[in-house]
Design a protein with these regions (language model features):
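Lipid interaction determinants
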Residues: 1-114
């Protein structure tokens, strides 16, 4: 799981959605137990702990720039950070990483960056 990842989809209250075109969501899980990344408009950081497939993320802190465009970027950012913090389990298959919430739902899917 350690390393840089690009987000491909996020679970929101109304279902799973792909990342909005023209935006980039990322997460880099460091060997020091810190996660950093881009939530589209802002950057974030915080602790994470991984024990086997069990995972806890957060609390996350982020910069607070306003998202002016594209449409929906602000909501996407809030949804991504909430989904990331909701993760309790991870599953990695090759270059794909899936984070699941406590209900067993896919919260975030990511592809290895690069």
């Amino acid at each position: 799981m350690a390393g840089a990842w690009d987000v491909t989809s996020v679970l929101y209250d109304d279902g799973i959605r792909s990342v909005i075109a023209g935006t980039t969501l990322t997460a880099t899980f460091g060997p020091d137990g810190r996660v950093t990344g881009s939530s589209g408009c802002n950057t974030f950081r915080g602790p994470y702990e991984e024990q086997g497939e069990e995972l806890s993320v957060g609390p996350l802190a982020s910069t607070r720039k306003a998202c002016k465009s594209p449409d929906g970027a602000q909501a996407q950012e809030r949804g991504y950070l909430a989904a990331l913090e909701s993760a309790v389990r991870s599953e990695q298959t090759g270059s794909r990483l899936t984070l699941f919430n406590a209900k067993g739902q896919m919260a975030v899917t990511l592809q290895r960056a690069g």
